[in-house]
Amino acid sequence: MARWNICSYCGKPFEPGTGKMYVRNDGRVLFFCSRKCERYYFMGRNPRKLKWTKAYQEARLQRGKR
């Protein structure tokens, strides 16, 4: 059974056979669940500033749910 991948940008798990795998020149492998995540990553957007990402939700818990 194939394992589920986790999006490198938003942190959402997604099914095998969907999404995109991107391999950088240094050998690091990035998985993207959608074109939106892929585009935001390559534009240099910080996932901690976008409410729909897991990184934002974790950062929010650390800073005290303002």
From Swiss-Prot:
Pfam families: Ribosomal_L24e. Binds 1 zinc ion per subunit. Binds to the 23S rRNA. One of its GO terms (cellular component) is ribonucleoprotein complex. PROSITE patterns: RIBOSOMAL_L24E. GO terms for molecular function: rRNA binding; structural constituent of ribosome; zinc ion binding. A zinc finger (C4-type) spans 7-37. SMART domains: TRASH. CDD domains: Ribosomal_L24e_L24. SUPFAM superfamilies: Glucocorticoid receptor-like (DNA-binding domain). The gene is rpl24e. Its cofactor is Zn(2+). Part of the 50S ribosomal subunit. Forms a cluster with proteins L3 and L14. GO terms for biological process: translation. InterPro entries: L24e/L24_sf, Ribosomal_eL24, Ribosomal_eL24-rel_arc, Ribosomal_eL24-rel_N, Ribosomal_eL24_CS, TRASH_dom. Zn(2+) binds at residues 7, 10, 33, 37. This is Large ribosomal subunit protein eL24. The keyword Electron transport does not apply. The keyword Oxidoreductase does not apply. Keywords: Metal-binding, Ribonucleoprotein, Ribosomal protein, RNA-binding, rRNA-binding, Zinc, Zinc-finger. Belongs to the eukaryotic ribosomal protein eL24 family. It comes from the Archaea.
